Amino acid sequence: MKKISETFSYGGKQAVYSHKSNVNNCDMTFAIYTPPNEKNAPILWYLSGLTCSHVNVMEKGEYRQKAAQLGLVVICPDTSPRGENIPDEEDNWQFGSGAGFYLDATNNPYDKNYNMYSYITTELPQLIESNFEFDMSRQSICGHSMGGHGALIMALRNPKKYKSCSAFAPIVEPSTASWSSEAFKKFLGENKDVWNMYDSVSLIKNGYSFPEILIDQGLADSFLEEGLRPWLLEEACKNTDINLKLRMQPHYDHSYYFISTFMADHLEWHKERI
């Protein structure tokens, strides 16, 4: 693991590291904010959306002041593998670099590198545990858009690993959304049973559960009707044990102006449950 940068902020440290990923067969980069009293601190994972890297939320998310106050570690991984030898479609912002969809690809040639589900749930936490003294028994997860999708499926499939889950404008049913279904086909092939394992609505319909989920969604979001469709998740959660808190926010769009407005709320919500 190599430290790329480190800067003090609100008494804690904002750092960026790179490391060799075995599951993605490339070097990966992540950002991490450690609060002033970092030993045995709980962890909040933040998963970013399409076209993003660890940089976007680090520069625009406005999480550090509240994380320092609450004593939360915030880890922001990249959204995909990157590099010259990574298969990609340079002109397609909805697939490949910056658009790994937090799944483990099964189709050649993508299966050698696009294993973001295993990376986030297993490999990166193991690296963190080996290099820091955080409390790995207290982890929570959140994300935005594609990252909200990632947070939801990881929480639903690993309810004992994460203490809480929240999302900003998540893609709740990527298997049927226009900007994600084609990526699923390229990454996963035609087997819809495999697709369902990376689709939060399908997971819930198939009996997967998580105690409580918080979602904020902007009503001025241009992707709301075709790409996000939170009402599908709301419908899936009916008659289940999932306590879904869906907050539809007037006037807000899909940008980091929206995310940063409600970031402190989400951090406080997670700290109460972690």
Please describe what each predicted stretch is.
Residues 1-274:
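Non-catalytic cap/lid and distal C-terminal segments of serine-dependent acyl enzymes
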